[in-house]
Amino acid sequence: MPAPQDPRNLPIRQQMEALIRRKQAEITQGLESIDTVKFHADTWTRGNDGGGGTSMVIQDGTTFEKGGVNVSVVYGQLSPAAVSAMKADHKNLRLPEDPKTGLPVTDGVKFFACGLSMVIHPVNPHAPTTHLNYRYFETWNQDGTPQTWWFGGGADLTPSYLYEEDGQLFHQLHKDALDKHDTALYPRFKKWCDEYFYITHRKETRGIGGIFFDDYDERDPQEILKMVEDCFDAFLPSYLTIVKRRKDMPYTKEEQQWQAIRRGRYVEFNLIYDRGTQFGLRTPGSRVESILMSLPEHASWLYNHHPAPGSREAKLLEVTTKPREWVK
C-alpha cells in the first residue's frame, strides 16, 4: 500500500479547497450545537461554467435567525472587464496577446477561485452578527503557466449593543492567531478591517471590526495558508463563547427595532461597497442566492433616526464612528 501523500506537496489551490471544506463542516457543527435547528445543504454548479459549491443555510432557529456558510470552488475565464477592474491591484494580471496580431485576446484570462464565506445573524439583539471569509485566487497564462495569485479574507463582528468583553475576546483570539506568524500582522489587518468595512455615506464602520486582508501575496503561499488556517481556528472559540453569553438575554421590542436599523446598515455596505459581492455578481455563472446569502431576514430604515444621547444605542455609535483599539 503506498504511503499517503504529504498534503504540502499538493498545489496550493487543492490544499486551500481541502481546508475550506473541512472548516465548513467544523463551523456548521459548532453553530448547530447552540441552536434548535440544523443547517441544510444546498449544492450548486455553474452550469456551462466551471465549478460550483455548497451553501449550508440555517434559518428560523431559536439562536440564529438566518445564516449561511458557503464554500465555492469556481474556475473558467475571467472577462476582460473583470481583468481591467482588478489589474490595478495586481501588476502581473493582464490579458494574453494574440501571437499573430499582438493585440489582447477577447476571451479573458483563465482563473481559479475558492473560498469560504459566512455571515450569521442571531435572533437576540444582544448577540452580534458575524462575518468570516477566507479565499484564494489564481490566474494562468494561455500556455498554462501561472500568472498571478493571492489570498484574502478576515473575520469581523457587528453588534447592535456593545459589550466590551465580547469585542476584546474576538480581537484577542484573532491577534493571537496572527502573532504566531508576525506580531506586525494584527495591527495592520485590524486597521485594514476598520478601513474596508466603512460606510462612507454614513461616516461610520459596519461594526467593531476584526481582521481583514486582501490581494495578499507577500509571503510564501504555504506560510499564508497556515496563517489562514490559524485564523480559522480562532473563530469558533471566540464567536461561540460570545453567543452563549447573549443568546438567552431578555430583550425589548425597542431593542429589536434598533437591531433592524443596524442591519439596514449591513445591507447598505454589502450591496454598495463590498468587493466580494461586486466580483460575484460580475462573474459569469455565479449564483446570486449564495452571493446575497449575507443579507439579513429583517432590516429597517427609519427616516432621520438618531438614538438618544447617552443611550446604549448611542454608545455603539461612538465606536462605529471612531474605531478603537481592543487589545494591547
Swiss-Prot record:
EC number(s) given by UniProt: 1.3.3.3
Statement: the UniProt record of this protein carries the keyword Oxidoreductase: yes
GO cellular component term, pick one: cytosol
Record: residues binding substrate: 117, 133-135, 285-290
Location(s) in or outside the cell: Cytoplasm
Signal peptide (from-to): none
Pfam families linked: Coprogen_oxidas (PF01218)
Gene, per the UniProt record: HEM13
Pathway assignment: Porphyrin-containing compound metabolism; protoporphyrin-IX biosynthesis; protoporphyrinogen-IX from coproporphyrinogen-III (O2 route): step 1/1
PANTHER family with a match to the protein in the record: COPROPORPHYRINOGEN III OXIDASE, MITOCHONDRIAL, OXYGEN-DEPENDENT COPROPORPHYRINOGEN-III OXIDASE, MITOCHONDRIAL
Note: Present with 22000 molecules/cell in log phase SD medium.
Functional note: Involved in the heme biosynthesis. Catalyzes the aerobic oxidative decarboxylation of propionate groups of rings A and B of coproporphyrinogen-III to yield the vinyl groups in protoporphyrinogen-IX.
GO biological process: heme biosynthetic process; protoporphyrinogen IX biosynthetic process
Site label Important for dimerization, positions: 201
Family annotation (InterPro entries): Coprogen_oxidase_aer, Coprogen_oxidase_aer_sf, Coprogen_oxidase_CS
Organism, scientific name: Saccharomyces cerevisiae (strain ATCC 204508 / S288c)
Protein keywords: Cytoplasm, Disulfide bond, Heme biosynthesis, Oxidoreductase, Porphyrin biosynthesis
Assembly mode: Homodimer.
Name of this chain's protein: Oxygen-dependent coproporphyrinogen-III oxidase
